[in-house]
């Protein structure tokens, strides 16, 4: 089956609150139920964060994206999409539970927030990526 989902445009902004917006900078990947984006946001004191944003957007439900970035579902599929969104939220809860398990040292993602916007659900995940250059940051002080 061809993947005809329309991703959020680069530069699209999702408003979390009055002072926190998430800006889409890239598409990172796709799964059967989601599209994952690279994104940035500035926290309440202006510090920039690189994050991943996972959008609940199942390929097999033939959703369409409106100009305002909301997802529309065909008549008769609303309940199925609501069930999928609930399972998406349950996976977030499970990931948080795994992340918080004491003694577990192999966590694959760091889920941080659930966002309900655009008639769908997003999972905000922190991005822990770097290289040996981090030593320079600490030795410079």
Predicted ranges, named:
Residues 1-19, 23-26:
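Juxta-kinase regulatory segment immediately upstream of eukaryotic protein kinase catalytic domains
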Residues 25-32, 36:
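Protein kinase glycine-rich loop
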Residues 26, 93-100:
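Conserved alphaC helix of the protein kinase catalytic domain
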Residues 41-94:
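ATP-binding glycine-rich loop module of kinase domains
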Residues 50-52, 108, 124:
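Short hydrophobic-acidic sequence motifs that mark active-site Asp/Glu residues
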Residues 102-121:
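Short beta-strand micro-motifs within the conserved protein kinase catalytic domain, predominantly
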Residues 117-126, 134-135:
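A conserved loop-to-beta-strand element in the N-lobe of protein kinase catalytic cores
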Residues 133-141:
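AlphaC helix of the protein kinase catalytic domain
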């Amino acid at each position: 089956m061809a993947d005809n989902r329309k991703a959020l445009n680069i530069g699209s902004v999702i408003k979390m609150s009055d002072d926190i917006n998430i800006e889409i900078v890239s598409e990172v990947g796709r799964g059967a139920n989601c599209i994952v984006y690279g994104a940035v946001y500035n926290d309440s004191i202006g510090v920039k964060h690189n994050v991943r944003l996972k959008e609940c957007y199942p390929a097999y439900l033939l959703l369409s994206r409106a100009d305002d970035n909301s997802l529309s579902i065909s008549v008769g599929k609303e309940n199925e999409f609501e069930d999928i969104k609930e399972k998406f939220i349950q996976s977030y809860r499970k990931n948080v539970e795994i992340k918080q398990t004491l003694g577990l040292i192999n966590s694959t993602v760091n889920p941080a927030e659930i966002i309900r916007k655009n008639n769908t659900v997003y999972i905000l995940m922190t991005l822990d990526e770097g290289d040996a250059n981090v030593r320079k940051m600490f030795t410079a002080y």
